[in-house]
Amino acid sequence: IKDLLEAERLYKTLPSAQQWQPNKRTSLPMVHLLLSRAYLYMEEWEKAATYANHVITNGNFHLLDLNTIKTYSEEDPSIPSYINYHSYTTSSEVIWVYGNITDVTKYVYNASASTNDHPFFRASKELMNCFDETENDLRKERYVIRSKFQIINEDNELEAMPSAFGKINVSSKAYYQPVATNDAFGRSLRLSEAYLNFCEAKAMLYKAGVANAGQEALNTLNEFRRFRFPL
């Protein structure tokens, strides 16, 4: 915490235009998000909510509306389409990018460009069912990447296997395998975490007796949901 607070102090000495830039470097909103996460772990709910709100109200970031993300190729509607959610250019939520795609996926996917090679793992039935608990959850088709490797599911139906990874850069020409490039990263700190941190912190404050905190949590959660479910 001490180091993060010192980093916050130093970043605030910079002009606002230099406190964050989409250049893969650390920044003030990155520090704010990490402080929110740390205070949440420490159960210091008010501080967690305060720092999460700093990120939420930062004008550099906006929730990405999944209603606007196509799930198929415009050239051929039969071909699924996925975007990289850990990219400054494709997601307005990204605060900081990090991590090699190969490091993220090498233990769950065989990178050989052949339909005969099997992925090591698939997204669990329990996870997939979670998306079905709420009607028309947009995250299922946009976050969970379907490989061209087909499986027989629990209903004895043939389906494209849901991969044990998502949100990353993949190739439609190589069986939707992960593609590592100099500008493609496997992980990122994103605005969406700030929303979840804020909601959890406010919910815990409500549980502790802060009367208006519950409504704040609900309002923020409903605002977040507008970008993850059909309009």
Regions found by a protein language model. Give the residues of each.
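Short, cationic low-complexity segments
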Residues: 117-140
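Active-site-adjacent substrate-recognition loops and nearby beta-strands
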Residues: 108-120
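Acidic/polar-rich alpha-helix caps and helix-coil junctions
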Residues: 1-108, 132-231
